[in-house]
């Protein structure tokens, strides 16, 4: 599929997720088969652009593949300016967040709260598309709640504005992450517009990815929570969609991917932040590799990157 001038070589994308899709995780997922990965959501508020967190999110050196950056805000001029700044820092695709269900985001009239204001959506999309010379994409939910589903209206506004691709998470904001994703809504959008459509929600296995693509007609699928502690899922999905073959990495191969991820994470964040951020990722890996193990508690008590790597290597030796 194409997004603007870019040919994407895999139909499996990594979703933008705050606190998750930092550069080390994006690089790993790209190496394992993700055709496109999105950065963590960047606020368009200029007051926070100079923080350490923003500095790391703006770090686009050493990216693999196309550099797609997600931004979130509610003021058209501010969002357009943020898009230009990110392009200046190396963004090759700008993604606009209108799907985040978090209260702290919605209180600022950003994320999925914007779905309640279609006219504002149109102004934001027009402003950003006209501000940058890179493809602009959009991520939404199906609506604010079950009585206010306006995904078709938003999709048509997006297409008119020149949005290059639309990702739809098959839930309303009110659903958060509960219940089942409504793939029939994604199918309806695919039938109503001509731009590429990316299906998102509950895609956690190769067969599920194929079923969703077949049912909705979507051009690609986007993986979010299913990738936690399972970056090899991208390799499994890509192999299955291309050949129909199921691959299952060995425990040792998965452990080596975990070690590589944590080493890269430590290097990216440094000693003080690295060991803290590693804890959640290792917890997710352990849920896959050694469910029920007491090692998680031991690992979380460690307070240096060196101690963490020694402990992880000892664990790997014990479970091979």
From Swiss-Prot:
HAMAP family noted in UniProt: DusB_subfam
InterPro entries, per the entry: Aldolase_TIM, DUS-like_FMN-bd, DUS_fam, DusB, DusB-like, tRNA-dHydroUridine_Synthase_C, tRNA_hU_synthase_CS
EC number, UniProt record: 1.3.1.-
Keyword Magnesium included in the entry's annotation: no
Reaction catalysis annotation: a 5,6-dihydrouridine in tRNA + NAD(+) = a uridine in tRNA + NADH + H(+); a 5,6-dihydrouridine in tRNA + NADP(+) = a uridine in tRNA + NADPH + H(+)
One Pfam family linked to the record: Dus
Cofactor: FMN
Top enzyme category: oxidoreductase
Residues at which FMN binds: 16-18, 70, 139, 200-202, 224-225
Originating organism: Haemophilus ducreyi (strain 35000HP / ATCC 700724)
Highest taxon listed in the record's lineage: Bacteria
Alphabetically ordered keywords of this record: Flavoprotein, FMN, NADP, Oxidoreductase, RNA-binding, tRNA processing, tRNA-binding
Function: Catalyzes the synthesis of 5,6-dihydrouridine (D), a modified base found in the D-loop of most tRNAs, via the reduction of the C5-C6 double bond in target uridines.
Name of the protein in question: tRNA-dihydrouridine synthase B
């Amino acid at each position: 599929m194409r997004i603007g001038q870019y040919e994407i070589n895999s139909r499996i994308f990594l979703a933008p997720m705050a606190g998750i899709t930092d550069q080390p995780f994006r690089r790993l997922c790209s190496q394992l088969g993700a055709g496109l990965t999105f950065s963590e959501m960047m606020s368009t508020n200029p007051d926070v652009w100079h923080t350490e967190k923003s500095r790391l999110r703006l770090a686009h050196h050493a990216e693999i593949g196309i550099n797609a950056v997600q931004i979130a805000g509610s003021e058209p001029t501010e969002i357009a300016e943020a898009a230009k700044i990110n392009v200046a820092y190396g963004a090759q695709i700008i993604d606009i967040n209108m799907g985040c269900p978090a209260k702290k985001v919605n209180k600022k009239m950003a994320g999925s709260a914007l779905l309640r204001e279609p006219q504002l959506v149109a102004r934001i999309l027009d402003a950003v598309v006209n501000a940058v010379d890179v493809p602009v994409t959009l991520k939404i939910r199906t609506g604010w709640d079950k009585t206010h589903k306006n995904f078709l209206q938003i999709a048509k506004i997006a297409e008119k504005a020149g949005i290059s691709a639309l990702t739809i998470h098959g839930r309303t904001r009110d659903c958060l992450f509960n219940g089942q994703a409504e793939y029939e809504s994604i199918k309806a959008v695919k039938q109503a517009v001509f731009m590429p459509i990316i299906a998102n929600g509950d895609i956690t296995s190769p067969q599920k990815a194929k079923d969703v693509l077949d049912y909705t007609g979507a051009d690609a699928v986007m993986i979010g929570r299913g990738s936690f502690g399972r970056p090899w899922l991208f390799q499994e999905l890509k192999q299955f969609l291309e050949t129909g073959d199921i691959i299952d990495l060995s425990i040792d191969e998965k452990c080596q991917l975990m070690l590589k991820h944590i080493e890269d994470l430590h290097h990216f964040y440094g000693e003080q932040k690295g060991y803290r951020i590693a804890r959640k990722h290792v917890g997710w890996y352990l849920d896959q590799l050694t469910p029920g193990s007491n090692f998680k508690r031991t690992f979380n008590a460690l307070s240096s990157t060196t101690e963490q790597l020694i402990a992880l290597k000892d664990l790997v030796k014990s479970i091979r």
